[in-house]
């Protein structure tokens, strides 16, 4: 069961990482839109660019920012959104399959308790078999040691 829980956690982590990358892509690549009745607001890169060009001497050197990726066409952006949504749906379905395979889903508490008792009895039987095998191993080991010792004495 812990194996399935680990798989679910890994898949959820992958889903969240995928969503984070996709949101970053959308933030960088989304075409600006102006709501009806409002004026366009400059983006932060545009504001920084204007300030730097207006006052080239007054701005102290700033640490280099990562380069802004080249803008893509609106058609490519829409295609990327469709691909992102497909990826998210597929990953979400994988997580749902893992969750559905967890034991105890759609099983009553009484059935789970009964199953645990069955497994406990089975485990006790297997433990008895293991203990018998260990005793048998000890007897055989003693016989082998005795034979080896008798061969050593007869020389």
Curated annotation (Swiss-Prot):
Main location: nucleus
Protein localization: Nucleus
Protein name: Mediator of RNA polymerase II transcription subunit 21
UniProt source species: Phaeosphaeria nodorum (strain SN15 / ATCC MYA-4574 / FGSC 10173) (Glume blotch fungus)
Compositional bias annotation for Pro residues: 58-69
Residue ranges of the region described as Disordered: 29-73
Pfam families documented for this protein: Med21
PANTHER family linked: MEDIATOR OF RNA POLYMERASE II TRANSCRIPTION SUBUNIT 21, RNA POLYMERASE II HOLOENZYME COMPONENT SRB7
Keywords: Activator, Coiled coil, Nucleus, Transcription, Transcription regulation
MF (Gene Ontology): transcription coregulator activity
Coiled coil: 75-147
């Amino acid at each position: 069961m812990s194996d399935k829980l680990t798989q679910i956690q890994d898949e959820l982590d992958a889903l969240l990482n995928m969503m984070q990358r996709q949101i970053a892509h959308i933030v960088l690549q989304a075409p600006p839109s102006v709501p009806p009745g409002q004026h366009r607001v400059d983006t932060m890169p545009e504001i920084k660019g204007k300030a730097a060009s207006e006052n080239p001497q007054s701005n102290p050197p700033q640490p280099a920012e990562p380069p802004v990726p080249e803008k893509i066409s609106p058609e490519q952006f829409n295609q990327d959104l469709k691909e992102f949504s497909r990826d998210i749906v597929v990953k979400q379905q994988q997580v749902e399959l893992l969750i559905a395979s967890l034991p105890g889903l759609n099983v009553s508490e009484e059935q789970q308790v009964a199953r645990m008792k069955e497994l406990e009895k089975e485990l006790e039987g297997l433990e008895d078999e293991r203990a018998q095998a260990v005793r048998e191993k000890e007897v055989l080991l003693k016989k082998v040691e005795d034979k080896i010792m008798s061969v050593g004495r007869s020389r």
